[in-house]
Amino acid sequence: MLTDGKHRPGSVKMGYYALRFLFCNIYHKEWAKAYLPTPKVAKTLPLVLSQDEVTDVLGAIRNFKHRTAIMFIYSTGARVSECVNIRLTDIDSKRGQVNIQEGKGLKQRKVPLSPVLLSLLRSYFKKYKPQHYLFEGAGGKGTHLGVAAVREICKKARYGTPRIKKAYTPHTFRHCFATHHLEHGTNLLVIQRLMGHADLSNTLKYLHVQQLNPDQVINPLDKLNGLEGLCKDK
């Protein structure tokens, strides 16, 4: 698999770990990397839309509930699975925050509630009157919008945004949340907490996709004392 060129790096890596599991857990042998080198898997950068592109996509989503769900992801950085599982009790308008449950471990992170998102949700409540989950499913009370249904929202929106050639998905808006925060100057450690990343390296990847504004970059040479004299031929 390592040399025939017929398998994707991810498949090779899965085969590697399966073989190591068999060697260590079934045959109870000590594993050494010398037996087989760890396959290298190229890291791909996250797909990110510009803020103008985000506006175009949101404008292409006609259904108010569907548009609100995507705006919720973009405003909070929630994963799609976290978004659909948000309950009404997770929205704390008094403290101005959203409580996001992270997976099965029920670990929780608190994300600031944007004034724009809060206003949007109030309009949403008036129209849909959700009872339990914020984004209820077709079954009504006690059910929530499915992950596949949220993916379908973006799939349909792509037909309405032919100028955007990027194959964006709902998760793209989580990437946009982090990247646009960086572009607006939010501290990387703050973004790590907002995203729920246990490892900072998962957050660092957004440094590679952010668009740098030349007006925000201060060159250290420009801040030296005594520049006037240094820039003249003596």
Functional labels for PLM-detected ranges:
Residues 1-234:
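Conserved catalytic core of the tyrosine transesterase superfamily
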